[in-house]
Amino acid sequence: MPTAVSDAAAPAQARAWIEAAERVMVLTGAGVSAESGVPTFRDALTGLWARFNPEDLATEAAYREHPRMVWDWYQERRARVSQVQPNPAHLAIAALATRKTVALVTQNVDGLHQRAGSVGVIELHGNLFANKWLDGCGKCDVATAEPGRPPRCAACGAMLRPGVVWFGERLPVVANYRAEEAANTCDVCLVVGTSGMVYPAAGLPGLAKDHGARVIVVNPEPSVLDETADLVIHQPAGVCLPAMLA
């Protein structure tokens, strides 16, 4: 159960726990990026894409069947994300890492943490601006890919695909290992802007708590992670983190 403190006192209590910690794990979700104007996957698509469900486009099967359409959708997403800026929450998390040992684990693919100055970000779901080969001949080279929608290998015709984790795919092995290691060794697990509905990421706060960490949840709305938390702060991240992490 969360520690019994008033809503007004909760940020100060969180700050005290973080200051006393040697190792802090920060887990961020779509809510952090939403404060910068990045749509979440729960938001309805607009414009030319209004008739589609994002979960129907972000799959390997959809890409193999409609590669041009899905590639174009990701290109539009890249263009939109390129126009937004990191918000005060991103900046506060980056600043914390200049004076604390911080493992930053994110479910977001937009690269806003890196643009805010965070380094060594553990990207559980990949990166929107990266590409990788869907298949490959062993000689595929991104640098010499033939232009197209999508680009293809000049040797075998394999398609480039966005470097994100699609629905039904496993998390990157190294990123998942690093995230679990951070959960196992942190003193405080700060969970920001996630609904706690997407696994395996949603299991990390519980893993941290099982290993003795205090869990702090920051989210405007109640989430399933509130039951795991030692402290819950129902505020937007950009509002409370700058002072809480200063």
UniProtKB/Swiss-Prot annotation:
It is an enzyme of class 2 (transferase). The keyword NAD applies. GO terms for cellular component: cytoplasm. Its cofactor is Zn(2+). It catalyses: N(6)-acetyl-L-lysyl-[protein] + NAD(+) + H2O = 2''-O-acetyl-ADP-D-ribose + nicotinamide + L-lysyl-[protein]; N(6)-succinyl-L-lysyl-[protein] + NAD(+) + H2O = 2''-O-succinyl-ADP-D-ribose + nicotinamide + L-lysyl-[protein]. Transmembrane segments: none annotated. Gene3D superfamilies: SIR2/SIRT2 'Small Domain, TPP-binding domain. The active site is at residue 125. NAD(+) binds at residues 29-49, 107-110, 193-195, 219-221, 237. Binds 1 zinc ion per subunit. Residues 2-246 form the Deacetylase sirtuin-type domain. Zn(2+) binds at residues 137, 140, 153, 156. The keyword NAD applies. Keywords: Cytoplasm, Metal-binding, NAD, Transferase, Zinc. Its EC number is 2.3.1.286. One of its GO terms (molecular function) is histone deacetylase activity, NAD-dependent. It is found in: Cytoplasm. Substrate binds at residues 74, 77. InterPro entries: DHS-like_NAD/FAD-binding_dom, NAD-dep_sirtuin_deacylases, Sirtuin, Sirtuin_cat_small_dom_sf, Sirtuin_class_III, Ssirtuin_cat_dom. Belongs to the sirtuin family. Class III subfamily. 2 residues (Tyr-74 and Arg-77) present in a large hydrophobic pocket are probably involved in substrate specificity. They are important for desuccinylation activity, but dispensable for deacetylation activity. NAD-dependent lysine deacetylase and desuccinylase that specifically removes acetyl and succinyl groups on target proteins. Modulates the activities of several proteins which are inactive in their acylated form. This is NAD-dependent protein deacylase. It comes from Ralstonia nicotianae (strain ATCC BAA-1114 / GMI1000). The lineage of its organism: Bacteria, Pseudomonadati, Pseudomonadota, Betaproteobacteria, Burkholderiales.
